[in-house]
């Protein structure tokens, strides 16, 4: 879509986040990094906004910004999400959740699995061999396109997590949220939604960044941190039990480990 078309769509519906995201991308492709940042500032943080923000800042710092250079930089960046997550950010959340699964549900196979905030499908890829059915949900249409291209999911939905969980649908033996809850503050509604979709012997496995004190807080990178006390309390309120809660490092930022938790909840 052209910039003018997207701006027109946003005048008609200012809450259309998909159009906002595409507008930020369009400004970047046009070499207008500052304008792209202005649009990104109006969006909730997500893996994709972080990716685009990083690209915009790279462009602003770049000595040359001719159209060909910008297009090359953008295409390279958009296509390399997985490489960036695993390489530059030391993203290990799927591996951490696999280890946790082997502890709390050893030997389980042929599972119905739901991947919350599936992104490009990195967690789905890690768990595919345990799945009889693998479904995914993500807020970003572009991420879902990449996940679909892997050919590992049975069903993919573009939706926010609470909406997807509230709908009538199958029950799951395993619900995954790898590095997803850092984009949500209060987890009460999602925990309640998951509780309603878990099979009697089902598990929710997730990673989160560690917060201080009793509750949850917004960190400097616009990523939410949750305290152990909050996670335990929110689980109980949703009618879930804590089957496991261990210290973990789901990712690195600027070479430094980000402290977090790997958590297993069950019915």
Question: What are these model-derived regions, one by one?
Answer:
Residues 223-239, 245:
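Short alpha-helix
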């Amino acid at each position: 879509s052209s910039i003018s078309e997207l701006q027109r769509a946003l005048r008609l519906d200012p809450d259309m986040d998909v159009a906002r995201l595409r507008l930020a991308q369009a400004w970047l492709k046009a070499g207008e990094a500052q304008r792209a940042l202005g649009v990104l500032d109006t969006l909730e943080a997500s893996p994709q906004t972080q990716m685009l923000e990083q690209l915009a800042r790279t462009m602003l710092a770049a000595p040359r910004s001719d159209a060909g250079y910008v297009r090359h930089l953008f295409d390279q960046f958009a296509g390399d999400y997985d490489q960036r997550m695993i390489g530059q950010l030391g993203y290990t959340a799927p591996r951490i959740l696999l280890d946790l699964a082997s502890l709390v549900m050893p030997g389980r196979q042929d599972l119905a699995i739901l991947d919350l905030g599936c992104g490009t499908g990195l967690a789905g890829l890690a768990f595919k061999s345990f799945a009889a059915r693998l479904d995914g949900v993500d807020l970003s249409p572009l991420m879902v396109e990449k996940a679909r291209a892997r050919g590992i999911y049975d069903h993919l939905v573009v939706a926010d997590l609470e909406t997807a969980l509230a709908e009538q649908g199958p029950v799951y033996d395993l619900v995954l949220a790898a590095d997803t809850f850092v984009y949500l503050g209060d987890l009460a509604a999602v925990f309640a939604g998951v509780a309603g979709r878990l099979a009697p012997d089902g598990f929710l496995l997730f990673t989160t960044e560690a917060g201080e004190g009793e509750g949850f807080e917004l960190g400097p990178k616009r990523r939410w941190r949750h305290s152990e006390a909050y996670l335990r309390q929110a689980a109980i309120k949703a009618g879930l039990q804590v089957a496991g809660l261990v210290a973990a490092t789901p990712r690195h930022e600027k070479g430094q480990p980000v402290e977090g938790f790997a958590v297993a909840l069950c019915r």
